[in-house]
Amino acid sequence: MKYHIEKNTVQETLVILVYGRKMCSELFPNIFRDETAIRLMDAIAYDFSELFKKSDSTMQRFDFLEVAMRQSDLAFEVRDYLKSHPTAAVVNLGCGLDATGRSCDNGSCKIYNLDFADVIAVRNALLPAGEREENIACDLNDTAWFDNIDASGGAVFFAAGVFLFS
């Protein structure tokens, strides 16, 4: 059964980013490949026709390249940090349906995905937390969520999806 996403909702922003990562994976697989985004496209019931139409423009393809480079650089930095802090907390602020933490998992780190409650509800349905992973519903402006992060082995924070919409 597919997960239905309504137009003109906060959850629609999740679809736009998943679509962008899927297109990056298809157009620039040597730079960035997101198997989770490819799989999620099949799990989401949404009218992608408008996004498909825009995908053919040169400007949109450049945007996809920019996303691919940003995601690749971000994953590089997280993996590099984990080399010297293998049991660190990997904290994805405004995670949406992003699986960067999972793609950087070294088998010892702890992964924390933080977002609004309605977003975490979608994430739990489509990307349930795995081993050593926790999806936390919160408002990033209320720092009480810090109490849920075990940073005893260090911590690396990133917010790839937050600043696009702020």
Role assignments for model-derived ranges:
Residues 144-145:
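Short acidic active-site motifs
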Residues 141:
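Adenine-nucleotide cofactor-binding loop residues
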Residues 1-91, 95-138, 148-153:
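Rossmann-like AdoMet
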Residues 154-166:
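A short SAM/SAH-binding and catalytic strip from SAM-dependent methyltransferases
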